[in-house]
Curated annotation (Swiss-Prot):
GO biological process: cell division; meiotic cell cycle; positive regulation of transcription by RNA polymerase II; regulation of cell cycle
Record family assignment: Belongs to the protein kinase superfamily. CMGC Ser/Thr protein kinase family. CDC2/CDKX subfamily.
Name the UniProt record assigns to this protein: Cyclin-dependent kinase 7
Keywords noted in UniProt: ATP-binding, Cell cycle, Cell division, Kinase, Meiosis, Nucleotide-binding, Nucleus, Phosphoprotein, Serine/threonine-protein kinase, Transferase
Modified residues (Phosphoserine): S157, S163
Region (Disordered): 333-360
Domain Protein kinase positions: 4-288
Cellular component aspect of the GO annotation: cytoplasm; nucleus; transcription factor TFIIK complex
Function per UniProt: Catalytic part of CAK which activates cyclin-associated CDK1/CDK2/CDK4 by threonine phosphorylation, thereby allowing MPF activation.
Coiled coil regions in record: none
The gene coding this protein: cdk7
Biased composition regions of type Polar residues, renumbered to the chain: 350-360
Active site, UniProt feature: D130 (proton acceptor)
InterPro entries reported for this sequence: CDK (IPR050108), CDK7 (IPR037770), Kinase-like_dom_sf (IPR011009), Prot_kinase_dom (IPR000719), Protein_kinase_ATP_BS (IPR017441), Ser/Thr_kinase_AS (IPR008271)
Length: 360
């Protein structure tokens, strides 16, 4: 704790509070999450929630530009503290800010960073299981990073089962709504498809009020799942037969979207999980190589409420970096002066030559 100056409380989560702090040695602004240690159900003997431990383990192993960076872990007064890079806002704030006009190039940039982050997770056998706009955080440089790995799980073991009660309901895949306990990375891809739609619509695509209503919303938008378009669906534990309903063509809903964007989202929002596109294949989709080039992250729009504080933080960061650079230069100059002030060693050959000359 001595390494940090705690400045202000900035949030509170399920397992603790989050404060803004500064690293004393460097001036770096960070976020410190304090994990509460209270002995309740589903916790270790030390009183730390299993989800918090799982999040720590996963973030220690996952190092990627589009995954939030866990910088430090320490204990203080019987509490555990996680130190993260400070993120400025989340994607939900961008979507809801009506002063922002999201251009196709902006959406492409968000989607590219989101897919890069989840591809890194899946490559390391991690399911996020709770992708939604307010879990996608933005850095001071405009980089999108996946956060909140409290529901994340390692996958890949044969017959491994999970709870279907994962993922916020707007972004929950149909196999989870039907009670599947064995599933894979396709649940994250479904969530990303819903986020893609939300970026284009500026409102949640499938805003259900409960599991049954969520399934109704899905059927209304995408048609009705059956053994023809999803073999095995009728065998899922909580399968319910819905009235046959035709799908609404994506082009009819996303009128301004390119053909490539329509094709990509249609491959993400397929009923059959086995047929959904993978994150790696999505990154190689023509959507990212055709049409407008994605916006540079540093040029992405900033929520109106964050502009003033962001400018101030960038100025402070620039000043701190300048001070650190000057300090390094001074240290280098001092080292050079010390080297120059040291007397040159006397060469033995020169001494012998001088003695011989004196004898002559």
């Amino acid at each position: 704790m001595d390494k940090y100056n705690i400045e202000a409380l900035i949030g509170e989560g399920t397992y603790g509070v989050v404060s803004r702090a500064t690293v004393k040695a460097t001036g770096q602004i960070v976020a410190i999450k304090k994990i509460r240690k209270i002995l309740i159900q589903n916790q270790t003997d030390d009183g730390i929630n299993f989800s918090a431990i799982r999040e720590i383990k996963i973030l220690q192993e996952l190092k990627h530009d589009n995954v939030v960076n866990l910088l430090d872990i320490f204990a203080h007064k019987s509490n555990v503290y996680l130190v993260f890079e400070l993120m400025q806002w989340d994607l939900q704030e961008v979507i809801e800010d009506k002063s922002i006009i999201l251009k196709p190039a902006d959406i492409k940039s968000y989607m590219k960073m989101l897919l890069q982050g989840i591809e890194a997770c899946h490559r390391n056998w991690v399911l996020h299981r709770d992708l939604k706009p307010n879990n996608l955080l933005m850095s001071i440089n405009g980089d999108l990073k996946l956060a909140d790995f409290g529901l994340a799980r390692q996958y890949g073991s044969p017959n491994k089962v999970f709870s279907p009660q994962a993922v916020t309901i707007f972004y929950r895949a149909p196999e989870l709504l039907f009670g599947a306990k064995s599933y894979g990375p396709s649940v994250d891809i479904w969530s990303i498809g819903c986020i893609f739609a939300e970026l284009m619509l500026r409102t949640p695509y499938l805003p259900g009020t409960g599991e049954i209503d969520q399934l109704r919303k899905i059927c209304s938008a995408l048609g009705t799942p059956n053994e023809s378009n999803w073999p095995g669906v009728t065998c899922l534990p909580n399968y319910i037969k819905f009235t046959d309903h035709p799908a609404t063509p994506f082009k009819q809903l996303f009128t301004a979207a390119s053909d490539e964007a329509i094709d990509l989202i249609s491959k993400m929002l397929l009923f059959n999980p086995s047929n959904r596109i993978s994150a790696a294949d999505a990154l190689n989709h023509p959507y990212f190589t055709s049409g407008v080039k994605h916006t540079n992250p540093a040029d992405l729009p900033v929520p109106f409420a964050k502009k003033a504080s962001l400018l101030q933080q960038r100025q402070v960061l620039a000043q701190v970096q300048q001070q650190l650079l000057q300090k390094q230069q001074q240290q280098q100059q001092q080292q050079q002066q010390q080297i120059q002030s040291q007397p040159e060693p006397i060469q033995v050959d020169n001494v012998e030559q001088t003695q011989q000359a004196q004898q002559v």
